[in-house]
Amino acid sequence: MTRLYTEEFSSEQLVCSTCPHFEECGSCQLQHISDEHYKTWKADRLKTLLAENELEIEEWLEPVFISEGGRRRVTLNALRHENEVFIGYNKYHSHDLAPIKNCLLLTPQLQSIVEKLPQALKNIAHKNHAIELLVQEADGGLFDCVITGLDETGARQTGSIAAMAEQCGLARISFRKDAFSKCETQVSLTPIKKTNGAITVDLPAAAFLQPSAAGEAALIDAVLQGLSRHKLGKKDKVADLFSGCGTFAGHLLNKYTVHAAEGDWAMANSLVEAAKGHARFSAEVRDLFKEPIVGRELRDYKAAVFDPPRAGAKEQAQMLAKSNLPVVIGVSCNPSTFARDAKILLAGGYKLKTIQMVDQFTWSTHTELVGVFEK
């Protein structure tokens, strides 16, 4: 049962879920709330969390809500039992699989691939051995797939993997032992690229992409709007920290001089290669948890954008707080660690000017936000 927080809502606020898997699947928690009350609850929950952390916010911008049917990346679990493969999400607070036939969150193209996976995996998945699949869409409707927990290959299996790529419409399939292991490409039918504003990267396997194109656009717009409050030109340097494959860097490059720093070697290297030939763009492989950009390096910059993973950016926030950057923009998928990092920036003399909530984790308790800090 995934009907969370039911005690917080009156019976008038509850609705019947349109998803047949809602009672078992652990992916969505809030499908049983009316759309109006869902949006109010999401926004109020974020405001309450930040207020509890004693953050003074000058302006709350109108929240952005991304509707279902737009998710272009998904992580699924698969389990083969006898000659049948079951695909789905884990049950809520459990490692047990909740098989699904379809998911209302996904784009039609991604849903079509998910429907074909059970048959395609029959000759690849081992009996009673759970595996994880990441499938995501890049430029041109090309799909990348990474299978975690299955690292054995052989002539027969290689043929099955190639057949899976053809059957499911996957441009590339890679294996990795676990989430921390290097991806080993098994089949690559077409080069996969991702264009972000002024740059195009060769997308590494398992590279991070925002869950939805609409959510990505909303976050980019929020960042650019935050910087537009300041009179910066193409010669002014902006640091893009925890840059991934350049989601923000490429769009910043249209207006400013940009330096990107990313700790994941594959993603950072894709930016290093993309930077060749760009006079106003540079990139480096840098673990910002262990080696944050410090004050003396920030002297030449006019702004910084940071978009860390869920763990936040404590070490980097401490360095930014000591800087004299007129504007720092934080993007976060975890309001709790954002609040911690924001308190560090405020203690360093920054003011939290605006908060923009972007809800692209539809029907879940998670949300994303963009905060603009000024000094």
Question: Where would I find each of the regions flagged by the language model?
Answer:
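Feature of Fe-S/electron-transfer and energy-metabolism proteins
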Residues: 65-72, 135-136, 240, 245
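Short beta-strand micro-motifs enriched in acidic
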Residues: 77-81, 136-140, 374
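Short, well-ordered strand-loop elements centered on a beta-strand within folded domains, enriched
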Residues: 82-91, 141-148, 181-183
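Extended interfacial segments that mediate partner engagement and assembly in macromolecular machines
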Residues: 4-17, 23-128
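Short, solvent-exposed loop/turn elements at beta->coil junctions and helix N-caps
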Residues: 60-67, 132-136, 178-182, 356-360
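A short, glycine/Asx- and small/polar-enriched loop/turn
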Residues: 68-72, 141, 365-366
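Internal alpha/beta scaffold segment
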Residues: 96-131, 137-139, 151-174
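Rossmann-like S-adenosyl-L-methionine
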Residues: 3-9, 123, 152-375
